[in-house]
UniProtKB/Swiss-Prot annotation:
The chain crosses the membrane at residues 10-29, 39-57, 87-110, 124-144, 158-183, 187-205, 304-324, 354-376, 407-430, 444-462, 511-532, 696-716. Keywords: Cell membrane, Glycoprotein, Ion transport, Membrane, Phosphoprotein, Sodium, Sodium transport, Symport, Transmembrane, Transmembrane helix, Transport. This is Sodium/myo-inositol cotransporter. GO terms for cellular component: apical plasma membrane; basolateral plasma membrane; membrane; perinuclear region of cytoplasm; plasma membrane. It comes from the Eukaryota. It catalyses: myo-inositol(out) + 2 Na(+)(out) = myo-inositol(in) + 2 Na(+)(in); scyllo-inositol(out) + 2 Na(+)(out) = scyllo-inositol(in) + 2 Na(+)(in). It is found in: Apical cell membrane; Basolateral cell membrane. Gene3D superfamilies: Sodium/glucose cotransporter (1.20.1730.10). Induction: Induced by hyperosmotic stress. Pfam families: SSF.
Length: 718
């Protein structure tokens, strides 16, 4: 009989929803969502604790609870390799990539590629690829896994549940922006860890300890005779009934079908660089840090937290197979269909089955809230990051003169568009059931992301890499990967009791080896074409490579108080007013010619500094909130003051409420003095500065977390 929610369970779930919505509305009150950086980068005001929790929970979504536990049930420890690998790659993000992103002054990863190489070809290519991956892999898999848990554990209507969750998540993201996302992620991280640890302790106590888990897992084979008699199956064949011989090893022999160690090190690891160091969902959170110390601290915290999934998700999945062997390890497609509604296998129900059978009343509601937290955290991450990429890397190319207000509106409309696509994808997701969902995700990503990882690594570590090399190398890798992906879908793996008649290059070459080839072929083509074509300009590599860390060039000499402006890449327009020289700092993306024709009242974000004397006390047309708001890196450089005033005068209470609710206007957008603006610029300059004491502490943490990661790999692979 299917378990149902008790009154206590319902109360806990309801309390969770109330807390989440309260946090979202709190973010609406406290944050400045009416600017590009305020909405998309949380005003660069987040601490390492909040960002570290957000990094963890954004990655550990519902597909991890379903997919990781399912792969643990099907193949043992192997899937834990991705978690320990992430632990190490997070530090690569914090110590190498993030300083470059901050120094480059970018919001999105496509924007970085555009700034590093010039032009828009690579920017558009990467933006389109990211949106495809978000919508058709991350989003679809998250919805399926979350819906599977709800359906398996609670018996709720699948479509109503999914639509409700999507709607709440979209409302939270649209109203609060990244501040709301990070605040709620902090709550959800705590909730996830408590709930998952509780289930882990209960399940291990049920088995009798960790060593007993390993012993009994290797004996967890279904009773074929009993199953045939119980279900009266017409198909008496059985397959994949016994645990794999290397189930208790993580990195396995080179021909293993799950994790061959050469493929994982040479192919999967470089491919994972895209997710952890160049994926908007992850990087956008770290870019919201107050400074580089908080950014590094957040990756250290997330790295330590990545030790947990192996024990709180993978091991419970293995325990589920031990306790419910005949269901989790179904013997053939007909049996699997009767047990879980999927002919490919039933390992994906391992975690929800464990929850419903072992967790007592009350705690079951907590676990339900954990799964909702996982689903919503992933969805809000995708909604926010995808809308950022679309708004700043696609829409901005179409509407180059778009105001900051227009960008905010477009970002929110795109979230609504993604909601519609998500709901339309639900029927397709229900049919897209695989035996090991998590490995399915990795396979799709490994066909598309290795070329991107190669481009980012070459862009950062090799100054000679230019736009032509990156474009042709990236496109070659993309075409090869797309062809392999199409072939993989065209020649699907047969059911386990059927012969495999696929071509040898499909069935015998592991996807990690394909990823290896894509990564190195892309890199080779990029290097060759770059060497045969002109090198990049000095401006393109001035702040965008690893070797230009300290190279902040000052274009004009101003007074010491004005130095904070120099870290931004700006052109200087010199003009004369009443025999007094004035420097206007022109935001990126604007030429002098485009500025000269503007009237003072039409200019909103030109920052003025005088060469002699103190700055003026106030500047009537400056409304910048933070250093990032002032420049917006070319994204919101100019906004029409006249249009804003007209809208304010004509709008009634209703429109004022709508503006506040959606973050189009903010009570904090008062006129700012130039002195305040310069102080904020000083803070921006200090983002890359670290004291010696902080450096020592962070480096000790780096050594500790990397040592732990390597130890885990060795311990679980020998």
């Amino acid at each position: 009989m299917r378990a149902v929610l008790d009154t206590a369970d319902i109360a806990i779930v309801a309390l969770y929803f109330i807390l989440v919505m309260c946090i979202g509305f709190f973010a609406m009150w406290k944050s400045n969502r009416s600017t590009v950086s305020g909405y998309f980068l949380a005003g660069r005001s987040m601490t390492w604790v909040a960002i570290g929790a957000s990094l963890f929970v954004s990655n550990i979504g519902s597909e991890h609870f379903i997919g990781l536990a399912g792969s643990g049930a099907a193949s043992g420890f192997a899937v834990g390799a991705w978690e320990f690998n992430a632990l190490l790659l997070l530090q690569l993000l914090g110590w190498v990539f993030i300083p470059i992103y901050i120094r480059s002054g970018v919001y999105t990863m496509p924007e970085y590629l555009s700034k590093r190489f010039g032009g828009h070809r690579i920017q558009v290519y990467f933006a389109a690829l990211s949106l495809i991956l978000y919508i058709f892999t991350k989003l679809s898999v998250d919805l399926y896994s979350g819906a599977l848990f709800i359906q398996e554990s609670l018996g709720w209507n699948l479509y109503v549940s999914v639509i409700l969750l999507i709607g709440m998540t979209a409302l939270l993201t649209v109203t609060g922006g990244l501040v709301a996302v990070i605040y709620t992620d902090t709550l959800q991280a705590l909730l996830m860890i408590i709930g998952a640890l509780t289930l882990m302790i209960i399940s291990i106590m049920e088995i009798g300890g960790f060593e007993e888990v390993k012993r009994r897992y290797m004996l967890a084979s279904p009773d074929v005779t009993s199953i045939l008699l119980t279900y009266n199956l017409s198909n008496t064949n059985s397959c994949n009934v016994s645990p794999k011989k290397e189930a208790l090893k993580m990195l396995r022999n080179p021909t293993d079908e799950d994790v061959p160690w050469p493929g994982f090190i040479l192919g999967q690891t470089p491919a994972s660089v895209w997710y952890w160091c160049a994926d908007q969902v992850i990087v956008q959170r770290v870019l919201a840090a107050k400074n580089i110390a908080h950014a590094k601290g957040s990756t250290l915290m997330a790295g330590f937290l990545k030790l947990l999934p192996m024990f709180i998700i993978v091991v419970p999945g293995m325990i589920s197979r031990i306790l419910f062997t005949d269901d989790i390890a179904c013997i053939n497609p007909e049996h699997c269909m009767l047990v879980c509604g999927s002919r490919a296998g039933c390992s994906n129900i391992a975690y929800p089955r464990l929850v419903m059978k072992l967790v007592p009343v009350g705690l079951r509601g907590l676990m339900m809230a954990v799964m909702i937290a996982a689903l919503m955290s992933d969805l809000d991450s995708i909604f926010n990051s995808a809308s950022t990429i679309f708004t700043l890397d696609v829409y901005k190319l179409i509407r180059k003169s778009a105001s900051s207000r227009e960008l905010m509106i477009v970002g929110r409309i795109f979230v609504a568009f993604m909601v519609v696509i998500s709901i339309a994808w639900v029927p397709i997701i229900v049919e897209m059931q695989g035996g090991q969902m998590y490995l399915y995700i990795q396979e799709v990503a490994d066909y598309l992301t290795p070329p991107v990882a190669a481009l980012f690594l070459l862009a950062i570590f090799w100054k000679r890499c230019n736009e032509q090399g990156a474009f042709y190398g990236g496109m070659a890798g993309f075409v090869l990967g797309a062809v392999r992906l199409i072939l993989a879908f065209a020649y699907r793996a047969p059911e386990c009791d059927q012969p495999d008649n696929r071509p040898g290059f499909i069935k015998d070459i592991h996807y990690m080896y394909v990823a290896t080839g894509l990564f190195w072929v892309t890199g080779l083509i990029t290097v060759i074409v770059s060497l045969l074509t002109p090198p990049p300009t000095k401006e393109q590599i001035r702040t965008t490579t690893f070797w230009s860390k300290k190279n902040l060039v000052v274009k004009e000499n101003c007074s010491p108080k004005e130095e904070p402006y120099k870290m931004q890449e700006k052109s200087i327009l010199r003009c004369s007013e009443n025999n007094e020289t004035i420097n206007h700092i022109i935001p990126n993306g604007k030429s002098e010619d485009s500025i000269k024709g503007l009237q003072p009242e039409d200019v909103n974000l030109l920052v003025t500094c005088r060469e002699e004397g103190n700055p003026v006390a106030s500047l009537g047309h400056s409304e910048a909130e933070t250093p990032v708001d002032a420049y917006s890196n070319g994204q919101a450089a100019l906004m029409g003051e006249k249009e804003r005033k007209k809208e304010t005068d004509d709008g009634g209470r209703y429109w004022k409420f709508i503006d506040w609710f959606c973050g189009f206007k903010s009570k904090s957008l008062s006129k700012r003095s130039l002195r305040d603006l310069m102080e904020e610029e000083a803070v921006c300059l200090q983002m890359l500065e670290e004291t010696r004491q902080v450096k020592v502490i962070l480096n000790i943490g780096l050594f500790a977390v990397c040592s732990l990661g390597i130890f885990m790999f060795v311990y679980f692979s020998l």
